[in-house]
Amino acid sequence: MKRIRDVLSHENSNNTNYSDTNDTDYNDSHKLEKQYYEIDYEKFLLDSDIQEKYTKHIEYMLNKLLNKYKNKFVKKIIYDNLITNIINDFSDIIIDLSNQLDYVKQLTNKDFANKQIIDNMLIFLVKYEKILHSALARFVDIYFMRRLLDKKYVTNAVVYTGAYHSVTYIYLLSKIGFQMTHIVKSMVQSVAVANIVLNDIDDVSYRRNIYNLMYFFENNPFSQQCIDVSKFPKSFL
């Protein structure tokens, strides 16, 4: 995680291209990525060669997300609204996890028998599982939004995804002039109310009010995989 944060921070400050990653490195590491799921996990952790090639694969993908844009305006949108927030999020997460680790290290055996201490630790772990899930999901979001907005041949898009991804897409598109026009099976049925909520969100960071958008999806009694879009404009289909 620290490595990802450092790469993003370096690119954000210097805006330079990598010279040590190429398509050959990517192809090799992509094969190793698939191998990763087939080998013993401990072996992967102990094999420095596999780790190095896997890291190059990650850096190659990050380089694409950070530098490979045809439209400078799209690049600025993604940098300002997603990449900068990811850097800040990872920095905060690393600090929080480090502090928690220091706290755990100073606990005694007697402390571990204290139910309140254990409950607090479990609450922390559950909280950060969601935070990490959201932060890492945004790498997929950047890849998708870059492709959607930067490719001239893409005119329409149908996205089938979960709430963590959807809130980012909704947030980013609202920042460049898009508005919700149709809603199906959401806790917020009013298009006007939905757009008011969007206008009040100023940051996609997990510490900010991006999670107001999760209300669109959470505890939804209508949650189903299929929806009726027959009343949507033809361009949606």
From Swiss-Prot:
Residues 1-26 are annotated as: Disordered. Pfam families: DUF5847 (PF19165). Residues 12-21 have a biased composition (Low complexity). InterPro entries: DUF5847. Belongs to the mimivirus R160 family. This is Uncharacterized protein R130.
